[in-house]
């Protein structure tokens, strides 16, 4: 009985420490929020950090152009015609604050912070590796809007080089989607062959800010190759060494809680995933595509995709079979994936994420009930053996070998497995941890209301009611557990303080996570009553 309590206590403390440590390990500097808007005119950017091809090094630009504004049902984007970079992206359907009209801004370029997506052509004849600097594209207008009844919106930019070659860069936006197609069309009207190579990169300022009392999640880079399905690449690691990974397909991304931006080149192309950190403190991660040779009179099309939006697993999987891994469930992903599917299934019926959390908690607890019953049955049997075990201790004294042998004979005679109460606990832990991470990583819970005073399941309870109720439920569970007379007094005190410790620990947790834990405790209390009633009938309590 004491060993089972020890394992339960150690297990709870270990899980708590593991979750806390995982958050701290994944913590990365988060840029300070700023209310500054994007500069009205697109100032030129130094292109020294644009990746080099076999020949040609980009030079600093000197042109200045007006930004091009693009509005769809999901995105509000601004494009710098100098190079054709996306320098601003607001997510129209995701608000900065609940109840406010201001959209969540993912990409921006302000005085103190840069987070933009660049793409271009490098190589011997690349327009972004010319001594004159990056190309200054021309557009037919500066404002583009996805009209009602229109499924796609094309934003064409054109550049004519000194040799007469026409380069067209087209941004294709889609209704209801956060991915943008970037298509280059090169019409070689010159008398000489051309050689170009497409690249795409994401640049973000490495700048720390004050962290909130809620434990932070990962913010930094990530990439995928044919050999490495998913790898985080922290800013501090990027500062130490540069990536240069050849691959077929692949992708490069910047991650933060709930949101992601990513370059996804064609899966059949030979690419190189690269990274660097510029002297100005900008972290860059991106890809270099294949080198194309374009004969005189020929036309070549080169394409890639860019995603800027929430960590929507369905949308991400449609772009790459590994991009959905940015929703990182850790080593228990194989459990978390079906749990997330079930959570989505319940929400599609009830229309409330809080109710869906309750339903999935009930489902998990229901499926684990046989293990829970086995656990408490074993604990009851061990409890009934305590007087006999105490007699063995008094009989054999310090002779541990004989006492151990006698205890094993007693267990065998009474048909009791001393580890029977521990194994169910150990089997349940992975499921509960996986469910925990599903609730933490699911962007769907952001700004999702429940009922009454809970208006956002992704933030802490403003009145701390749920954590207090959770603490009360733990106290009730503890009182329902019989305490063995032989239990160490220090251990008893530690167990008594557990509800208080967990209550304080959960004060700043997202209310969705606390709701899950509270409902789980309530169900556990009911299950204990049912199990104990059955044990009393068998004379085991």
UniProtKB/Swiss-Prot annotation:
The chain crosses the membrane at residues 6-26, 349-369, 420-440, 457-477, 500-520. Interacts with the Sec translocase complex via SecD. Specifically interacts with transmembrane segments of nascent integral membrane proteins during membrane integration. Required for the insertion and/or proper folding and/or complex formation of integral membrane proteins into the membrane. Involved in integration of membrane proteins that insert both dependently and independently of the Sec translocase complex, as well as at least some lipoproteins. Aids folding of multispanning membrane proteins. GO terms for cellular component: plasma membrane. PANTHER family: CYTOCHROME C OXIDASE ASSEMBLY PROTEIN COX18, MITOCHONDRIAL (PTHR12428:SF65), OXA1 (PTHR12428). The gene is yidC. This is Membrane protein insertase YidC. CDD domains: 5TM_YidC_Alb3, EcYidC-like_peri. The lineage of its organism: Bacteria, Pseudomonadati, Pseudomonadota, Gammaproteobacteria, Alteromonadales. Keywords: Cell inner membrane, Cell membrane, Chaperone, Membrane, Protein transport, Transmembrane, Transmembrane helix, Transport. InterPro entries: Membr_insert_YidC, Membr_insert_YidC_N, YidC/ALB3/OXA1/COX18, YidC/Oxa/ALB_C, YidC_ALB_C, YidC_periplasmic_sf. GO terms for molecular function: membrane insertase activity. It is a multi-pass membrane protein. Its main location: membrane.
